[in-house]
């Protein structure tokens, strides 16, 4: 099957049929090449943690993978690494990107959320993606990395070009990569000359028994933190608001008991996460997944979105239930590649929703068709019209 057939418009119907028919499917992947798709919870969870499934494209059989690639200076990131390189880089990053740093961001996140809501005024209508879900995380991530205010709109444009490229402008994605590479080259040079109180300056300075991050590793980490941190948060915030406004009973329950919010964020992530597919993997040897043997070097796609709707793991999975224990969802990964930015994504979503619901007691969906982005990498709305 062609993976794009129906998946962008009705992903959970497609995934349900696939889960019910077989554990692993032979498909045509997003890049147009043959691949394998894994959709059942136990199989997806096992695959995410299986060291035989490599993230390194060098393990792909020659000519079989033609997907998204970055220049070498941006490609040396955690999403393309296996141990021991992954272990080393993650350890160094962990010395700078600490729980204490994330905790210290909570107050600035709330101030940013309040300022964005102030700009909306007390009553009216708005596109909540453009006015809130997008500018909040780009502000947070740019503050985290020490990127000046005047460059933040550029990064929104660049990341949008990469995640949901315009078919009429295929050169835009390549141009965005070049622009980001040039920008981070200058930014790293400036941070070395004048370190600031920001994560990028700390990553430049971090040491571990004499080890340090290389220039390409710093460049690719800055790209990954900005790109993944921004995009995932935009989709998760927007999708969470849509889920709430589409389920008045759950919205009412959350308004009655705001203490539900931390657990609700986990349920939002399970119910409508920010991506339909995890990053591709390549077996370093023949691997059996769900009883199906996948030859070494072939492309494997796993779907946390499909796994999160597996009734074998989550009863009545197509129902949004803020009282559900959604722990164990796979939206943020599993195993050694579990999302390094998960605590920040949770904090941003929780704070964004708390501020929004406190400010607008009459928040509701506005008129107009809801359109999803045409991307398997970013499951999010083009716009979210609301009234308040």
Residue ranges and their predicted role:
Residues 1-388:
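Cytochrome P450
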């Amino acid at each position: 099957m062609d993976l794009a057939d129906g998946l962008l418009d009705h992903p959970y119907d497609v995934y349900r049929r696939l889960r019910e028919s077989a554990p692993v499917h032979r498909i045509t992947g997003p890049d147009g090449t043959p691949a394998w798709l894994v959709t059942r919870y136990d199989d997806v969870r096992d695959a995410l943690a299986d060291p035989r499934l490599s993230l390194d494209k060098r393990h792909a059989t020659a000519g079989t993978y033609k997907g998204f690639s970055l220049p070498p200076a941006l490609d040396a990131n955690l999403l393309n690494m296996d141990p021991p390189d992954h272990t080393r880089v993650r350890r160094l990053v962990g010395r700078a990107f600490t729980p204490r740093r994330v905790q210290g961001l909570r107050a600035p996140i709330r101030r940013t959320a309040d300022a964005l809501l102030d700009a909306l005024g007390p009553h009216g209508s708005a596109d909540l993606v453009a006015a809130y879900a997008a500018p909040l995380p780009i502000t947070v991530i740019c503050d985290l990395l020490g990127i000046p205010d005047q460059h933040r709109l550029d990064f929104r444009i660049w990341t949008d070009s990469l995640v949901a490229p315009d078919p009429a402008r295929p050169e835009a994605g390549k141009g965005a990569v070049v622009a980001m590479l040039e920008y981070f080259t200058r930014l790293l040079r400036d941070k070395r000359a004048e370190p600031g109180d920001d994560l990028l300056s700390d990553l430049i300075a971090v040491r571990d028994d004499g080890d340090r991050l290389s220039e390409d590793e710093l460049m690719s980490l800055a790209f990954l933190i900005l790109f993944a941190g921004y995009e995932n948060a935009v989709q998760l915030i927007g999708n969470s608001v849509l889920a709430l406004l589409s389920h008045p009973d759950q919205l009412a329950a959350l308004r009655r008991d705001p203490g539900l919010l931390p657990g609700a964020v986990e349920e939002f992530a399970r119910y409508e996460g920010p991506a339909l597919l995890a990053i591709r993997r390549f077996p370093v040897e023949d691997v059996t997944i769900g009883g199906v043997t996948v030859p070494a070097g072939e492309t494997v796609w796993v779907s946390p979105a499909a796994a999160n709707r597996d009734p074998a793991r989550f009863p009545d999975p197509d129902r949004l239930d803020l009282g559900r224990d959604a722990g164990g969802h796979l939206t943020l990964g599993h195993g050694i590649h579990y999302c390094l930015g998960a605590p920040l994504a949770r904090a941003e979503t929780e704070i964004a929703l708390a501020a929004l619901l406190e400010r607008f007691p009459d928040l509701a969906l506005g008129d107009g068709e809801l359109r999803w982005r045409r991307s398997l990498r970013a499951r999010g709305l083009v716009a979210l019209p609301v009234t308040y």
